[in-house]
């Protein structure tokens, strides 16, 4: 008889504490009490973000001949959002608990119930307990709540100056489709990619940096001939899933979620989410990225509303068509969170007293690690320190390198392990004699003696693709 297994505990809270303690992520406005809906990225967090963006851009744009980049405005003409359907349909069902007077998305409550019990609630919201008190729920009737964040341009806050902060980067791509096709001399199949901030008036932000009102997206719109869309859709689902595993995510912690037909967005014929097993309370899986077949909806609606022809004329086949669009849309900070959670580990390391200590280590892929190497003089010494600083300065020409001379060497190793630094380089008293240093690898803790003039080449060999 198989023994029942206890579900592994979520590492999200542990990782969140580490992120705050080591300067990856800070609560926004912490000196004023902070807010659940926004976070600031510290010195290490911004490096990790940039590394993720760099790997995405390399994978999606610079390594391909059929994709180019774009950086469109955050505030687009209001007509864009009216044409796209966002003003009319970008709403969520909002309910309020009559017990705590807190507001929730009704669809999230229903989905959480179904995930926990394996079936939808027989009596709808009436069967759902209050998330905060656990009491049988008493809810208001659902009402629609706009996810668009409004702003006003010009001297007067009136209807004429009403604009929206973009809820997605995609529309900036669609309205530039013709510009890019013409100036970059592209023809379907080809893609336009961009990375940028988007804003959504989320009812219930939370789960650390997972759901926020201001967030960063990595999106690409791939324009294809109608009839070839299903084949390209599957290609991008497979390609995007492989990107996460190539950067170190355990395949066991990833899954594909097919949106039911009745829950598809108004523009989509098929959407598949790439989800990560975060093990949130009440929801085991969380979406990292959606890959949607948006059909010809976007170019068609913008063509109709703007009066601009957004079709493509295929000279080889003497036919004109409006391209279909395949959209891989990833959340940058959700990816960052998944990489951190998946990389977090605890193991044992020898200490100075001959025993072992529990060490925390982020086993991040070297391409993502915020700091690539740390230079550590064995002690603060008039001979060692200048040599170590010179080495760090030389290596900084190529990589993000830390210099740390504070505390016992074992403690300094631990500090680098828990931020994911792949290599620690120790300058010791033997260095003064043999002109060599000790390089320690993060995961195995194995050490090698390398000549000073070979250190740069050693790191270059082990940090390919960063």
Curated annotation (Swiss-Prot):
<comment type="similarity">
    <text>Belongs to the class-II aminoacyl-tRNA synthetase family.</text>
</comment>
<dbReference type="GO" id="GO:0004820">
    <property type="term" value="F:glycine-tRNA ligase activity"/>
</dbReference>
<feature type="binding site">
    <location>
        <position position="168"/>
    </location>
    <ligand>
        <name>substrate</name>
    </ligand>
</feature>
<feature type="binding site">
    <location>
        <begin position="200"/>
        <end position="202"/>
    </location>
    <ligand>
        <name>ATP</name>
    </ligand>
</feature>
<keyword id="KW-0648">Protein biosynthesis</keyword>
<dbReference type="GO" id="GO:0005737">
    <property type="term" value="C:cytoplasm"/>
</dbReference>
<feature type="binding site">
    <location>
        <begin position="287"/>
        <end position="288"/>
    </location>
    <ligand>
        <name>ATP</name>
    </ligand>
</feature>
<dbReference type="GO" id="GO:0046983">
    <property type="term" value="F:protein dimerization activity"/>
</dbReference>
<keyword id="KW-0030">Aminoacyl-tRNA synthetase</keyword>
<dbReference type="InterPro" id="IPR027031">
    <property type="entry name" value="Gly-tRNA_synthase/POLG2"/>
</dbReference>
<feature type="binding site">
    <location>
        <begin position="210"/>
        <end position="215"/>
    </location>
    <ligand>
        <name>ATP</name>
    </ligand>
</feature>
<dbReference type="InterPro" id="IPR002314">
    <property type="entry name" value="aa-tRNA-synt_IIb"/>
</dbReference>
<keyword id="KW-0547">Nucleotide-binding</keyword>
<dbReference type="InterPro" id="IPR036621">
    <property type="entry name" value="Anticodon-bd_dom_sf"/>
</dbReference>
<keyword id="KW-0436">Ligase</keyword>
<dbReference type="Pfam" id="PF00587">
    <property type="entry name" value="tRNA-synt_2b"/>
</dbReference>
<protein>
    <recommendedName>
        <fullName>Glycine--tRNA ligase</fullName>
        <ecNumber>6.1.1.14</ecNumber>
    </recommendedName>
</protein>
<dbReference type="InterPro" id="IPR004154">
    <property type="entry name" value="Anticodon-bd"/>
</dbReference>
<keyword id="KW-0963">Cytoplasm</keyword>
<dbReference type="InterPro" id="IPR002315">
    <property type="entry name" value="tRNA-synt_gly"/>
</dbReference>
<keyword id="KW-0067">ATP-binding</keyword>
<dbReference type="GO" id="GO:0006426">
    <property type="term" value="P:glycyl-tRNA aminoacylation"/>
</dbReference>
<comment type="subunit">
    <text>Homodimer.</text>
</comment>
<feature type="binding site">
    <location>
        <begin position="331"/>
        <end position="334"/>
    </location>
    <ligand>
        <name>ATP</name>
    </ligand>
</feature>
<dbReference type="Pfam" id="PF03129">
    <property type="entry name" value="HGTP_anticodon"/>
</dbReference>
<feature type="binding site">
    <location>
        <begin position="327"/>
        <end position="331"/>
    </location>
    <ligand>
        <name>substrate</name>
    </ligand>
</feature>
<dbReference type="InterPro" id="IPR006195">
    <property type="entry name" value="aa-tRNA-synth_II"/>
</dbReference>
<dbReference type="GO" id="GO:0005524">
    <property type="term" value="F:ATP binding"/>
</dbReference>
<feature type="binding site">
    <location>
        <begin position="215"/>
        <end position="219"/>
    </location>
    <ligand>
        <name>substrate</name>
    </ligand>
</feature>
<feature type="binding site">
    <location>
        <position position="105"/>
    </location>
    <ligand>
        <name>substrate</name>
    </ligand>
</feature>
<dbReference type="InterPro" id="IPR045864">
    <property type="entry name" value="aa-tRNA-synth_II/BPL/LPL"/>
</dbReference>
<dbReference type="InterPro" id="IPR033731">
    <property type="entry name" value="GlyRS-like_core"/>
</dbReference>
<dbReference type="InterPro" id="IPR022961">
    <property type="entry name" value="Gly_tRNA_ligase_bac"/>
</dbReference>
<comment type="function">
    <text>Catalyzes the attachment of glycine to tRNA(Gly).</text>
</comment>
């Amino acid at each position: 008889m198989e023994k029942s297994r206890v579900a592994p505990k979520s590492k999200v809270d542990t990782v969140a504490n580490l992120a705050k303690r080591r300067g990856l992520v800070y609560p926004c406005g912490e000196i004023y009490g902070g807010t659940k809906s926004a976070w600031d990225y510290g010195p290490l967090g911004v490096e990790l973000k940039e590394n993720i963006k760099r790997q995405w851009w390399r994978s999606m744009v610079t390594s391909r001949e059929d994709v180019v980049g774009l950086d469109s405005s955050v505030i687009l003409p209001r007509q864009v959002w009216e044409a796209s359907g966002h003003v009319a349909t970008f709403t969520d069902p909002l309910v309020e608990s009559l017990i705590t007077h807190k507001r929730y998305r009704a669809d999230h409550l229903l989905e959480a119930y179904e995930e926990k019990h394996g079936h939808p609630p027989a009596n709808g919201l009436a069967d759902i307990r209050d998330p905060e008190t656990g009491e049988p729920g008493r809810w208001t009737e659902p009402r629609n709540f706009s996810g668009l964040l409004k702003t006003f341009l010009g001297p007067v806050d009136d209807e004429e100056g009403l604009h929206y902060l973009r809820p997605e980067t995609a529309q900036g791509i669609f309205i530039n489709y013709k510009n890019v096709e013409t100036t970059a001399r592209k023809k379907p199949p080809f893609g336009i990619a961009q990375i940028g901030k988007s804003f959504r008036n989320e009812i219930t932000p939370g789960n650390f940096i997972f759901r926020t009102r201001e967030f960063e997206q990595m999106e690409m719109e791939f324009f294809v001939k109608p009839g070839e869309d299903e084949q390209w859709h599957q290609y991008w689902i497979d390609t995007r899933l492989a990107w996460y595993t190539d950067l170190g995510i355990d395949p066991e912690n990833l899954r594909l979620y097919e949106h039911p037909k009745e829950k598809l967005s108004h523009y989509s014929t098929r959407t598949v989410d790439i989800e990560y097993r975060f093990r949130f309370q009440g929801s085991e899986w969380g979406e990292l990225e959606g890959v949607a077949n948006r059909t010809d909806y976007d170019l068609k609606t913008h063509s109709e509303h703007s009066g601009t022809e957004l079709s493509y004329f295929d000279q080889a086949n003497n036919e004109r068509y409006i391209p279909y669009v395949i959209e891989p849309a990833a959340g940058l900070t959700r990816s960052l969170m998944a990489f951190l959670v998946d990389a977090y580990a605890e193991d044992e390391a020898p200490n100075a007293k001959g025993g072992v200590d529990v060490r925390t280590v982020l086993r991040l892929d070297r391409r993502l690690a915020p700091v690539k190497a740390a230079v550590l003089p064995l002690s603060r010494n008039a001979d060692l320190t200048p040599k170590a600083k010179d080495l760090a300065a030389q290596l900084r020409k190529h990589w993000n390198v830390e210099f740390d001379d504070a505390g016992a060497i074992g403690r300094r190793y631990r500090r680098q392990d828990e931020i994911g630094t792949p290599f620690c380089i120790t300058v010791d008293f033997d260095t003064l004699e043999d002109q060599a240093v000790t390089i320690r690898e993060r995961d195995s803790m194995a050490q090698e003696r390398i000549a000073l003039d070979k250190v740069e080449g050693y790191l270059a060999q082990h940090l390919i693709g960063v």
